[in-house]
């Protein structure tokens, strides 16, 4: 009898632990979406010191990693968690959850709080992102992005670079070196938000419905893209 009760108690405790973990993972994922909204709003509020309009308006995908560094510490030892979305025929895809780790990060000592933004600029970069896991290299794969209202005419970001990376610290955006880092799907957050495992390719190609918890994030992405596009068109008419 005692053995049966012990097994039953262990089973109940295991179930409680599982539900607690699932609840915590969901809360963390929703919080990540909300913090990513703040980063996107910052992009829109600093056009002269932020990501160039033509870069943002031509990006095929946007990846936001809020609080890559907090209080001077890189969470998990050079490890951050973020959210990605890609353009589809119907607009922006539902958010896919990512983790970024390893590599050589060109961050200055003494920086306390840093957000990371990655922009996928061409089809090759898009295919890498859709693969669920890939490594960033410096040979055409990833480069520190140009900063300011307009990208320099001498840059080759439109044709050659798969992904441009930016850091945001104390409200200021800057290009960020991120060679050797590995970007992969965050399976725990994916399951927590969607209720099941879904592949990157399915989510980012527009085959997944946007969860309500991501409505604010999707709105911010759409507004940032539209603002950049309008500004670029105005500049072209001059």
Regions found by a protein language model. Give the residues of each.
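Bacterial N-terminal signal peptides that target proteins for export
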Residues: 1-9
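Bacterial N-terminal signal peptides
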Residues: 8-17
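Aromatic (phenylalanine/tyrosine) cluster motif
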Residues: 19-21
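Small-residue-enriched, tightly packed secondary-structure blocks
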Residues: 23-238
């Amino acid at each position: 009898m005692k053995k049966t009760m012990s097994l039953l108690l262990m089973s109940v405790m295991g179930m409680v632990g599982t539900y607690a973990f699932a609840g915590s993972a969901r809360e963390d994922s929703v919080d990540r979406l909300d913090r990513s909204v703040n980063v996107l709003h910052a992009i829109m509020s600093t056009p002269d010191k932020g990501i160039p309009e033509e870069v943002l308006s031509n990006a095929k995908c946007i990846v936001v990693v809020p609080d890559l560094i907090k209080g001077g510490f890189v969470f998990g030892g050079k490890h951050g968690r973020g959210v990605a979305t890609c353009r589809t025929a119907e607009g922006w895809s539902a958010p896919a959850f990512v983790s970024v780790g390893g590599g050589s990060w060109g961050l200055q000592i003494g920086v306390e709080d840093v957000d990371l933004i990655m922009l996928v600029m061409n089809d090759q970069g898009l295919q890498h992102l859709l693969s669920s896991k890939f490594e960033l290299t410096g040979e055409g794969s990833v480069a520190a992005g140009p900063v300011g209202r307009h990208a320099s005419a001498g840059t080759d970001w439109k044709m050659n670079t798969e992904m441009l990376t930016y850091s945001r610290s104390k409200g200021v955006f800057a290009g960020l070196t991120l060679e050797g880092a590995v970007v992969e799907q965050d399976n725990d957050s994916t399951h927590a938000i969607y209720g099941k495992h879904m592949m990157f390719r399915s989510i980012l190609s527009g085959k997944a419905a946007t969860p309500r918890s991501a409505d604010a994030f999707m709105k911010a992405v759409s507004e940032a893209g539209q603002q950049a596009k309008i500004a670029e068109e105005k500049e072209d008419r001059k």
